[in-house]
Amino acid sequence: KVFSSLTCPHCANFHEVIFNKLKIEYIDKNLVRFEHHSFPLDLAALNAEVVLRCNTNNDIKFKLLEEIYKKQNFWAVGSDINRINDLIKKVGLDFGLKENKMDECLKNNEVQDEILNQRIEATKKYKIESTPTVFINEKKYSGEINYKSFKKIIEKNL
C-alpha cells in the first residue's frame, strides 16, 4: 500500500525513481501487489485524484497515475484552482478522457467525499503523518527510503 498525494513532490519522486524499479522487478512479475491509496494534501491533489478515478479502465488509470506524477510541475502550480483543474484535465485528455466527463466527475461531491473519507480513515487506522507512506505486510515505512532499502525489505518478505 502506498499512501500518496498527487501534488506531493516526494511522492512524484518516489513514483518515478523507486516505484518504476519495483514495478519491473516485482509487480510485473506478480511477486508484489501495488495499491495506490489517495491521501490528498490539498484541493489540487483531491481534484487530480477525482480525474484519475473518472477513468474506469484500470490499465489506463495506472498509466494516467504515472503521467500525473510525471507532469506534476506542469499542472500543480499556483493557487488558482480553476487553472489547475484545466491543466489536470489536459493531462486526462492525453489519455482519452472526455472533457465533459472530467467536468462531471469534478462536480460530483460523492467522489470527493469518498476520497476524503478514505483519507480520514487512513489517518485513523494507519497513523499517516506524511506522504508518501508505504506499507509492506502491514509494516509502515515513511520518510526518505532509497530503492536499495526497499529491495532489501521486499526480498526479506518474499
Task: Give a label for each model feature.
Residues 1-2, 33-36, 133-135:
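Soluble periplasmic/extracytoplasmic beta-strand elements of cell-envelope proteins
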